[in-house]
């Protein structure tokens, strides 16, 4: 009986291990919906909006003896194709451009982190939101429709593959 239980436990653990490493617990790099925040210092209202960003698992390796060999570049989930969209911030004073542009992921891939165009930092536990304002007019800002401003750009990577606030001055 113990042999049968041991065999059953071994089968469950081996199948479970394969499922966990390739299944839904670690989704591969792909576009996902994310909520971002846009604000300008001169405009009184911060807007949150939903766009698609690149996120997910990219296979990687860490050397067992890192001092003996050079570091291996770790792939990150980043844009393969993207387009840009814009939103209008309400309440901006005259002379301040109320438009804010942001990337929309069309497709993603695992590739090297390009520090010039991508936030290569750590994953954020909490979604970013608008900074607290002293004025009560900034509470519960209205959601703004998205407007496309350009065509898809193959191979371009302009912004972070992690949710970031879009803040311009």
Curated annotation (Swiss-Prot):
Quote the PTM field. Microheterogeneity at Asn-33. O-glycosylation appears to be responsible for the beta subunit contribution to the difference in LH-receptor binding activity between LSH-B and CG-B.
BP-aspect Gene Ontology terms: G protein-coupled receptor signaling pathway
Q: Which GO terms describe its molecular function?
A: hormone activity
Which intervals carry biased composition (Low complexity)?
A: 145-158
- Disulfide-bonded cysteines: 29-77, 43-92, 46-130, 54-108, 58-110, 113-120
> Gene3D superfamilies, alphabetically?
Cystine-knot cytokines
Residue span of region Disordered: 131-169
Q: Which GO terms describe its cellular component?
A: cytoplasm; extracellular space
Signal peptide positions are 1-20
Membrane: present as a keyword of the record? no
Spell out the subcellular localization from the entry. Answer: Secreted
The glycosylation sites are 33, 138, 143, 147-151, 153, 157, 160-161, 169
Q: InterPro entries, alphabetically?
A: Cystine-knot_cytokine, Glyco_hormone_CN, Gonadotropin_bsu, Gonadotropin_bsu_CS
Keyword list, A-Z: Disulfide bond, Glycoprotein, Hormone, Secreted, Signal
Q: Please verify whether the record's keywords include Signal.
A: yes
Q: Which CDD domains match?
A: GHB_like
Q: How does it assemble?
A: Heterodimer of a common alpha chain and a unique beta chain which confers biological specificity to thyrotropin, lutropin, follitropin and gonadotropin.
What does this protein's UniProt record list under function?
Answer: Promotes spermatogenesis and ovulation by stimulating the testes and ovaries to synthesize steroids.
Which protein family is named in the record?
Belongs to the glycoprotein hormones subunit beta family.
Designated name of the protein: Lutropin/choriogonadotropin subunit beta
Provide the gene name from the record.
LHB
């Amino acid at each position: 009986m113990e042999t049968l239980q041991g065999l059953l436990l071994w089968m469950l653990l081996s199948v479970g291990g394969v499922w966990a490493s390739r299944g839904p617990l670690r989704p591969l790099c792909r576009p996902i919906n994310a909520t971002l925040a846009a604000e300008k210092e001169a405009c009184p209202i911060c807007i949150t909006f939903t766009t698609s960003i690149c996120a997910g698992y990219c296979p990687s390796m860490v050397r067992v003896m890192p001092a003996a060999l050079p570091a291996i570049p770790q792939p990150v989930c980043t844009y393969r194709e993207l387009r840009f969209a814009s939103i209008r911030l309400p309440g901006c004073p005259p002379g301040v451009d109320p438009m804010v542009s942001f990337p929309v992921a069309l497709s993603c891939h695992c590739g090297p982190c390009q520090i010039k165009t991508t936030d290569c930092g750590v994953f954020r536990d909490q979604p970013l939101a608008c900074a607290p304002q002293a004025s009560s007019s900034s509470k519960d800002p209205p959601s703004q429709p998205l407007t496309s401003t350009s065509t898809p750009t193959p191979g371009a990577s302009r912004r972070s593959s992690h949710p970031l606030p879009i803040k311009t001055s």
